Regions:
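Mixed-charge, low-complexity intrinsically disordered regions
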Residues: 1-96, 105-157
Length: 157
């Protein structure tokens, strides 16, 4: 997909664009078969809700399964001054974010502060653990001692 219009309208430096993705989904629009498989799932609704929380500044962090990065041979997020474009469930740009902090901790060691920064539900660690455990169990990867990539970010546009 081409994000030139969004980049231009928001006066972003095209040379600092890293990638575009949606919370819970990644970027299935790069592969139409993957997008069709995910279409109309709960993840599409959740992607919209989380993108809106980020746009409003209520969500300033996210978390992922470290082993997923390894399996997918994906680079870890990094603090490098570049930005990502957050997409909605239709693959449309919602906002641009830049990573401000990245660290890896065990699932059972994720802090209440990180849970609050994720901006979801009642902002408690108990809620964060419940929904993230459910999410990781869906993919068969949950373990209390699994490594979690915690990323903090700020909206830049």
């Amino acid at each position: 997909m081409n994000y030139d219009k969004f980049i231009s309208e928001h006066r972003l430096n095209p040379e600092k664009f890293r990638e575009a993705w949606a919370f819970c989904l990644g970027n299935p629009w790069e592969n139409p078969e993957e997008a069709d498989a995910l279409n109309d799932t709960e993840y599409f609704k959740e992607a919209d809700e989380l993108a809106q929380l980020a746009l409003e500044g209520k969500k300033t962090a996210t978390a992922g399964d470290f082993s997923e990065y390894i399996r997918e041979n994906s680079p870890l997020p990094k603090v490098d001054g570049k930005y990502d474009i957050v997409l909605n469930s239709k693959g449309e740009p919602v906002c641009a974010i830049t990573t401000t902090k990245v660290y890896i901790v065990k699932f059972n060691e994720v802090s209440a502060e990180h849970a609050r920064k994720e901006g979801e539900g009642d902002l408690t660690l108990a809620y964060w653990r419940q929904v993230h455990e459910e999410f990781f169990r869906t993919f068969g990867t949950f373990r209390p001692d699994m490594d979690i990539v915690c990323e903090e970010f700020q909206v830049i546009s």
